[in-house]
Amino acid sequence: SGCRNYQGPAWYRKHFVLPAETKGQRVVLHFEAAMGKQILYLNGKRIQEHLGGYLPFTLDLTANGVQAGDSCLLAVFTDNSDDKSYPPGKRQYTLDFAYHGGIYRDVWMIAKSPVAITDAIDSQIVGGGGVFVHFDKISEKSAQVYVNTEVQNDDARSESVTVETTLTDADGKVIKRSSGKLSLKPGEKKSIRQQMEVKNPTLWSPDTPYLYRVQSRIKKGNKSIDGGITRV
């Protein structure tokens, strides 16, 4: 528009009731991004602060005592004023790109089993946490795929689960599948590393941006209790 972006504080308020079907699950609010500095208040109590506007962050409702059926008031303070303590670190009028303000990406309510894959950012492990996929010995003939999956047990009792990882092509055809068991004490989290070899891989390039899918499942017996898909 040719105008300067709005700079300064902004407030958001949301009333909600935690759905009854989340009973026995761990519930978090996942913010994809909000620009600048954010302070979160739950039912009038300051809960946490987050700096920076490009990475997601979460608010753990369960850890803050919210249970299924509870009525909640969430207040979010955001401020995209110039601040050297987080990127971009310079005055906005010197930037050659639009600098957002407020909550500019989606916010999700996520309910998980007490035994589940961790959040990659909340885990605070470099090169780990959540589902971390990396590669080695890549050529047109073969590629080694390594999948690290971190699982946490928030239950009050020890649990034994199976981590099942399936690699598929873009059409959903199964290429490789690997599974392994984890035993977790209450409050414990562990990682499992699984290796798969892909023959004649379709390599990504700007001209052929082909992506495979890594499907992760946490199983208790024959029942899937958590999971997700990572595009690689």
Task: Locate predicted features.
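Accessory beta-strand-rich segments of carbohydrate-active enzymes
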Residues: 2, 6-127, 154, 170, ...
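Short strand-edge motifs at loop-to-beta-strand transitions and within beta-strands
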Residues: 12-14, 55-59, 180, 188-196
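Hydrophobic/tyrosine-rich beta-strand signature of extracellular beta-sandwich/beta-rich modules
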Residues: 76, 165, 214-216
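Beta-strand-rich binding/interaction modules
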Residues: 40-42, 140-183, 190-194
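Extracellular Ig-like/FN3 beta-sandwich strand-entry sites
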Residues: 24, 69-71, 142, 158-160, ...
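N-terminal carbohydrate-binding accessory modules
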Residues: 153, 215-232
